[in-house]
Amino acid sequence: MQCVETNNLKQLLEQVKPYTKKGKLATYIPELGNANPDDLGIAIYHKETEYVHAGSSQMLFTLQSISKVITLALALLDRGEEYVFSKVGMEPTGDPFNSIIKLETTSPSKPLNPMINAGALAITSMLKGANNEEKIERILNFVREITDNPTIHYSAKVATSELETAYLNRSLCYYMKQNGIIDNDIEELMDLYTRQCAIEVNCIDLARIGLIFAMDGYDPYKQKQIIPKHITKICKTFMVTCGMYNESGEFAIRVGIPAKSGVAGGIFGCVKGEMGIGIFGPALDENGNSIAGFKILELLSAQEGWSIF
């Protein structure tokens, strides 16, 4: 499969740029409300020809919910499938990503999947480490290895902004603690989770994450298996069924690749055995996905025949 050319990417960005006017920033996290809604960037990392990029592709933004894929992989490495899925389910939910409804109405009471906030918080609570500093360093080092970027760090400003306003996430934690899903100190867990979500990347970093998952955990440039194949399979399956919030079904039909979005405007996707895609567009649709990012992936998938279906 040929890699998309830079000029083609530039043309596609111009084509979808008007969609940014239809979206809104994630202002409920104060720091994210400072983004420029007109920013739009993309990078594609191919297994053989490195990467092409266009637009705001080197601008830093925070992973937010994209980090859920990273911590799921780490938790599976740390604890194994049996333990992880005794605490968190495998099913999609039709509710918003920060909803408490299914925790109250499902028996046994456990988060339906690792891509909603309740599930992601439970996953983060499973990570091994003596304290939060050790745990966040493990997460950062994992991201650094996948991206081949040793400078990756988190934004303390964004993490603090999230920590100060994360009332609903705290309530999810207390409810799960009541039901034996987590046993961590809630404020310590919230501190780690907000730092995890505030890890900063650009489109090129994100595309390289996509490439590693596209290659079943293998880094074709380092010629090294970074993540076990069976773990990437689990992660990619959740990306298909739950990765794009309440738009996951429509995304599967219109784009048809494993992908995960975050409310800072990032989306990463993977084309099996070929390439990873990283997108940044902070103007979001009503489901919390980059509105222009969704559209450019739809156009690229139709043009290049990416859909797995």
Curated annotation (Swiss-Prot):
GO BP field: glutamate biosynthetic process; glutamine catabolic process
GO molecular function, one term: glutaminase activity
Keywords: Hydrolase
EC number: 3.5.1.2
Enzyme class: hydrolase
InterPro entries to which the protein is assigned, alphabetical: Beta-lactam/transpept-like, Glutaminase
Residue sites binding substrate per the record: S65, N117, E162, N169, Y193, Y245, V263
SUPFAM superfamilies documented for this protein: beta-lactamase/transpeptidase-like (SSF56601)
Family under the similarity heading: Belongs to the glutaminase family.
NCBIfam families registered for this protein in UniProt: Gln_ase (TIGR03814)
Record's protein name: Glutaminase
UniProt gene name: glsA
